[in-house]
């Protein structure tokens, strides 16, 4: 199994990237919380990975931190949570935010994530509560301050908004809902990654 990849970032179109590892291009799906940490196109990056084998496809998921992958693996063990839903959960919340929501039994916050209904949220609480006791409350809701203004992504409002809407749809949001979320936060100076981040933050 592929557990870790180190290579040159060739393309990034949230939530997908193309990574060149010694001449081989790997397509990976990343949660947005990991996507924000990516370097500029053409630079080297290292990602922890998880391979999902299905009858119709092999899907490779990438994560900036090992803790993100660990939570992803815990999520897909939960009945009713597949890889795509786990990706949506990790895109909407950091590991710390998710842990905080679980420990405080914040069902309403979990059900705001696309694809997470009341029953799924209740299952997550039952199966994952108590697994995050080592995390301090002061660690929760830490703002990321290192999202670069990437010249590889159009900074024009229309282009950034279109890319952000496409990414949100890929994460499970309905087209009309994704468009509404983006319009609420879009600004001309923001990259698509920043628009996605602000839209997801505002949705919770």
Swiss-Prot record:
Region (Domain I), start-end ranges: 1-64
InterPro entries: DNA_helicase_Holl-junc_RuvA_I, Hlx-hairpin-Hlx_DNA-bd_motif, NA-bd_OB-fold, RuvA, RuvA_2-like, RuvA_C, RuvA_C_sf
Region: Domain III, residue numbers: 156-204
Any one annotated GO CC term: Holliday junction helicase complex
Subcellular location(s) per record: Cytoplasm
Single Gene Ontology MF annotation: four-way junction DNA binding
Swiss-Prot/TrEMBL GO biological process terms: DNA recombination; DNA repair
Alphabetic keyword roster: Cytoplasm, DNA damage, DNA recombination, DNA repair, DNA-binding
Principal localisation: cytoplasm
Chain intervals for the UniProt region annotation (Flexible linker): 144-155
Organism domain of life: Bacteria
Region feature (Domain II): 65-143
UniProt similarity note: Belongs to the RuvA family.
Record note on domains: Has three domains with a flexible linker between the domains II and III and assumes an 'L' shape. Domain III is highly mobile and contacts RuvB.
Assembly with partners or alone: Homotetramer. Forms an RuvA(8)-RuvB(12)-Holliday junction (HJ) complex. HJ DNA is sandwiched between 2 RuvA tetramers; dsDNA enters through RuvA and exits via RuvB. An RuvB hexamer assembles on each DNA strand where it exits the tetramer. Each RuvB hexamer is contacted by two RuvA subunits (via domain III) on 2 adjacent RuvB subunits; this complex drives branch migration. In the full resolvosome a probable DNA-RuvA(4)-RuvB(12)-RuvC(2) complex forms which resolves the HJ.
Function, as annotated: The RuvA-RuvB-RuvC complex processes Holliday junction (HJ) DNA during genetic recombination and DNA repair, while the RuvA-RuvB complex plays an important role in the rescue of blocked DNA replication forks via replication fork reversal (RFR). RuvA specifically binds to HJ cruciform DNA, conferring on it an open structure. The RuvB hexamer acts as an ATP-dependent pump, pulling dsDNA into and through the RuvAB complex. HJ branch migration allows RuvC to scan DNA until it finds its consensus sequence, where it cleaves and resolves the cruciform DNA.
Protein name per Swiss-Prot or TrEMBL: Holliday junction branch migration complex subunit RuvA
Organism: Haemophilus influenzae (strain 86-028NP)
Lineage, highest ranks first: Bacteria, Pseudomonadati, Pseudomonadota, Gammaproteobacteria, Pasteurellales
Gene: ruvA
């Amino acid at each position: 199994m592929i557990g870790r990849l180190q290579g040159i970032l060739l393309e990034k179109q949230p939530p997908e990237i193309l990574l060149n590892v010694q001449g081989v291009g790997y397509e990976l799906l990343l949660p947005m919380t990991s996507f924000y940490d990516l370097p500029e196109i053409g630079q080297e990056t290292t990602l922890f990975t998880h391979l999902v084998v299905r009858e119709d496809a092999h899907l490779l998921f990438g994560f900036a931190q090992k803790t993100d992958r660990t939570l992803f693996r815990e999520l897909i063990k939960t009945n009713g949570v597949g890889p795509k839903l786990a990706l949506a959960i990790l895109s909407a919340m950091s590991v710390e935010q998710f842990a905080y929501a679980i420990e405080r039994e914040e069902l309403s916050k979990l059900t705001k994530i696309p694809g997470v209904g009341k029953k799924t949220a209740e299952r997550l609480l039952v199966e994952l509560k108590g697994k995050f006791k080592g995390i301090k409350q002061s660690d929760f809701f830490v703002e990321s301050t290192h999202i670069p203004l990437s010249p590889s992504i159009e900074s024009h409002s229309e282009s950034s908004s279109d890319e952000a809407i496409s990414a949100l749809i890929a994460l499970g949001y309905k087209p009309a809902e994704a468009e509404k979320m983006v319009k609420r936060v879009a600004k001309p100076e923001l990259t698509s990654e920043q628009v996605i981040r602000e839209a997801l933050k505002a949705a919770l």
